[in-house]
Every structure is written in structure tokens, then in C-alpha cells.
Amino acid sequence: MESMAVATDGGERPGVPAGSGLSASQRRAELRRRKLLMNSEQRINRIMGFHRPGSGAEEESQTKSKQQDSDKLNSLSVPSVSKRVVLGDSVSTGTTDQQGGVAEVKGTQLGDKLDSFIKPPECSSDVNLELRQRNRGDLTADSVQRGSRHGLEQYLSRFEEAMKLRKQLISEKPSQEDGNTTEEFDSFRIFRLVGCALLALGVRAFVCKYLSIFAPFLTLQLAYMGLYKYFPKSEKKIKTTVLTAALLLSGIPAEVINRSMDTYSKMGEVFTDLCVYFFTFIFCHELLDYWGSEVP
């Protein structure tokens, strides 16, 4: 008799249908689902920027309904679960109600937290913006000051170099105009020009019919490269021009400029040799054609 009484107290009532015991939990679950759907829809509208005309009244009504629901949930007491087991079956209605209530409370708390994160108060956003702007302003001010100092130092150093180069140019111009310092041809330079002229005569007289005229010239240039170390070297004065001054001011090292100028001078010497070689060859060719036409 006692077991039957416990069963009737903790289980279902005899006059109520079987589905009416779970109606309260189902209602709470349905309310919770609707709230989540409404919250998600509102968040999407906020993100996308859509605002309905009656959005303010709806938000106020929704906040009031949320407060009422939370009060109801707090007022509801968790049903006690009997420890007795009737006919080997555990009492499940109390546990389901308890789980539903706890899940609902957690869901409302999570929803409130998400709302607070997604829609922060205007004062906090303004404070964050001001702090970010201040930090960025400090960083930009420091970087601008450092950049201005570095740029000023670099400008002063280049200005000093430009003044030195200007003095060198001014000192070199009068000497060039007076003609006191004349460029002296070194012995190796004269030897190169004479050798190119003689080679052109020999090629026109003997080799032109059987060999290309460029092969002897290239062979002569290779021979000059080997004979260069046996001739006395003359000191070459490097002139300061506007181009070298501009290169120095642009930050290129002086060693690189000297090497490039040395390379260009060697290329100029080879080009001069080639011009002498071709001029002599063509002159000899024209003379031979003229003499051949006169002789019967």
C-alpha cells in the first residue's frame, strides 16, 4: 500500500493523460527556442543595419518579457525527486524538469552575455575609441619625431658633402679653362694606337681575302691586356663632375663610383682603338682601289 501511494504521489495522476506531465517542460523549451530565434534575428538585423519602424517598442517589450520570464524561472522551485523505486522504474519526471530549468537559466544567461558583447554601451565604445586614438597618436608622433630627426641629420650630412664637391668643382674649372694642365698620353696609349694602325695595314694587305677583319683586332686587344703590366703606369686624375657629385649625394659609395669610372675608361680606350683600326683599314682600302684603277 505504501509503494502504491508513493507511485501515485511522485508519478502521474490517474485522471490526467500521459502527455500532460511533460507539458510544462515542453512549454519552457518552446519559449526558450522562440527567444533564441528572436535574439538571432535581431542580431542579424543589427549587423546588417536593418531597423524596423517599431523596433524601439519591440525591444522594450522583449526586455520586459525577458525579465518576467527570468522572475518566473527563479520563482519556480525544482521538484523533489523521490528516492523510492516502484516496480524497478526510476522517477524521470523530476529529473527532466530539473534539467529543463537549469538549461533554461543557462540559456538566458548566455543570451544576456551575448547581447552585452554584441551591443556594448556607447560610453565603453567611446572610451575604447579614444584610447586607441591616443595610442595611435602617440605612436605616430614618436615615429614622426624620429623620422624628422633622422631626415634632418641626413640632409645636413648631404649638404656638407655637396658643399665640399662644389668647392672641388670650382677649384677644377679655372685650371681647365687656363689650359695649364694638359692631358698627357702615356706610352702604352701611344703604343696601342700605333699597333692598331699597323694591324689595319697588314690585315688589308694580306689577311682580308682569307679571314675576317675582327679576329685580328680581338687578338690584339688580348695581347694588350697581357702587355699592360710591363709598361709604366701613369697617375690618372679623377675629375669631379656633376654626375659623380650626384652619385655621391645619392648614397653610392666612392669605391663603387671609382670602379665604374675605371671600367668606363677602359671601354673608351677599346672603342678608340676600334675607331683607329677601322679608319686605317678603310683608308688603305680606298687608296689601293684608287691606285689599281689608275694602273692599266
From Swiss-Prot:
Residues found modified as Phosphoserine: 55
Give a GO biological-process term.
tail-anchored membrane protein insertion into ER membrane
Per the UniProt entry, the disulfide pairs are 208-284
Segments traversing the membrane: 190-207, 213-231, 270-288
State the membrane topology: Multi-pass membrane protein
User: Highest taxon of the source?
Assistant: Eukaryota
Stretches assigned to the Lumenal side:
208-212, 289-296
**Methyltransferase among keywords:** no
Q: Which GO terms describe its cellular component?
A: cytoplasm; endoplasmic reticulum; endoplasmic reticulum membrane; GET complex; membrane
Q: Which ranges does the record list as Cytoplasmic topological domains?
A: 1-189, 232-269
Q: Which UniProt keywords apply?
A: Congenital disorder of glycosylation, Disulfide bond, Endoplasmic reticulum, ER-Golgi transport, Host-virus interaction, Membrane, Phosphoprotein, Transmembrane, Transmembrane helix, Transport
GO function terms (MF aspect): ubiquitin protein ligase binding
Q: In which tissues is it expressed?
A: Ubiquitous. Highest levels in brain, testis and ovary.
Its main subcellular localisation, reduced to a broad class, is endoplasmic reticulum
Q: What compartments host this protein?
A: Endoplasmic reticulum membrane
The job of this chain, per UniProt, is described as: Required for the post-translational delivery of tail-anchored (TA) proteins to the endoplasmic reticulum. Together with GET1/WRB, acts as a membrane receptor for soluble GET3/TRC40, which recognizes and selectively binds the transmembrane domain of TA proteins in the cytosol. Required for the stability of GET1. Stimulates calcium signaling in T cells through its involvement in elevation of intracellular calcium. Essential for the survival of peripheral follicular B cells.
State the associated disorder. Congenital disorder of glycosylation 2Z: A form of congenital disorder of glycosylation, a genetically heterogeneous group of multisystem disorders caused by a defect in glycoprotein biosynthesis and characterized by under-glycosylated serum glycoproteins. Congenital disorders of glycosylation result in a wide variety of clinical features, such as defects in the nervous system development, psychomotor retardation, dysmorphic features, hypotonia, coagulation disorders, and immunodeficiency.
Specify the protein name: Guided entry of tail-anchored proteins factor CAMLG
